[in-house]
Amino acid sequence: MTSLKLVIDTNILISAALSAQGAPAQLVMGVLARHRLVFSQATFDELRTRIYRPKFDRYISLDDRERLLGDFNASAIWVEAGEPGRYCRDRDDDHFIEAALKAQAHNLVSGDKDLLEAPCLQELQVVSVHQALEALGF
């Protein structure tokens, strides 16, 4: 299978980091092993900001968070995405769409209802974790 580029939203990446069990972790591990994650500075900054929230302290150590961010940073495809277009109700979601479009990503994977129900973008398929697992054969 050809290596594909995927943008995975912050909530899924954090879910995968907090629990090695379940669909988000299975997806992230599969993408890291066989495909490529895509980040823009805005999408990575959102992940960095959220993963350090104190509410996650009892689930993941600071060292593990640093290691995870380092691994993502080192293995990712980075895109220059300026001010995003207006695609969704939530402006923060637009950064993920913009990164996916700039990278010509295969999918944007999200559990966010706003993204999953965003007006159709001909160039981009927004899918759930389970849809991505099925499509990628994981």
Features from the language model and the residues they span:
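PIN-domain endoribonuclease scaffold, especially VapC-family toxins
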Residues: 30-83
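Acidic, PIN/NYN-like endoribonuclease modules and their adjacent C-terminal/linker elements
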Residues: 103-107, 113-138
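Short, well-structured N-terminal submotif of metal-dependent ribonuclease cores
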Residues: 1-39
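Active-site neighborhoods of divalent-metal-dependent phosphate/nucleic-acid chemistry enzymes
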Residues: 74-107
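Residues at secondary-structure transition points
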Residues: 22, 38, 60-63, 87-94, ...
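Short, ordered loop/turn segments at secondary-structure junctions
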Residues: 43, 112-113
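Hydrophobic/aromatic ligand-binding patch that stacks against planar heteroaromatic rings
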Residues: 29, 99, 118
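Short, flexible loop segments at the rims of nucleotide/cofactor-binding pockets, characterized by
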Residues: 14-16, 56-57, 83-89
